[in-house]
């Protein structure tokens, strides 16, 4: 299945990423190769192979929930480039401000 440069550009735009035309072409080629390799799995005969949902033997090991002291706010904020009313201010990712 061929992944086009237009598809890569579309996903990049949705992700707020910018790539050069050369990078977009390289991503399209690489993603096409990855999808082709995954599609090879459809050719594997899995008849009679039991369904596997978890390969790890560790299931739901729980520990006691113990409160621990947090970080010193002033010390953390020394590395923050921009803050507002006690919160870290980050660039907006929604053009219209969103529905929140």
UniProtKB/Swiss-Prot annotation:
Q: Which InterPro entries match?
A: Asp/Glu-ADT_sf_sub_c, GatC
GO molecular function, a single term: asparaginyl-tRNA synthase (glutamine-hydrolyzing) activity
Q: Which Gene3D superfamilies match?
A: Glu-tRNAGln amidotransferase C subunit, N-terminal domain (1.10.20.60)
Catalyzed reactions: L-glutamyl-tRNA(Gln) + L-glutamine + ATP + H2O = L-glutaminyl-tRNA(Gln) + L-glutamate + ADP + phosphate + H(+); L-aspartyl-tRNA(Asn) + L-glutamine + ATP + H2O = L-asparaginyl-tRNA(Asn) + L-glutamate + ADP + phosphate + 2 H(+)
- PANTHER family from the UniProt entry: GLUTAMYL-TRNA(GLN) AMIDOTRANSFERASE SUBUNIT C, MITOCHONDRIAL
Q: How does it assemble?
A: Heterotrimer of A, B and C subunits.
This molecule's function is given as: Allows the formation of correctly charged Asn-tRNA(Asn) or Gln-tRNA(Gln) through the transamidation of misacylated Asp-tRNA(Asn) or Glu-tRNA(Gln) in organisms which lack either or both of asparaginyl-tRNA or glutaminyl-tRNA synthetases. The reaction takes place in the presence of glutamine and ATP through an activated phospho-Asp-tRNA(Asn) or phospho-Glu-tRNA(Gln).
Provide the protein name: Aspartyl/glutamyl-tRNA(Asn/Gln) amidotransferase subunit C
Native species of this protein?
Streptococcus sanguinis (strain SK36)
Q: What is the lineage of its organism?
A: Bacteria, Bacillati, Bacillota, Bacilli, Lactobacillales
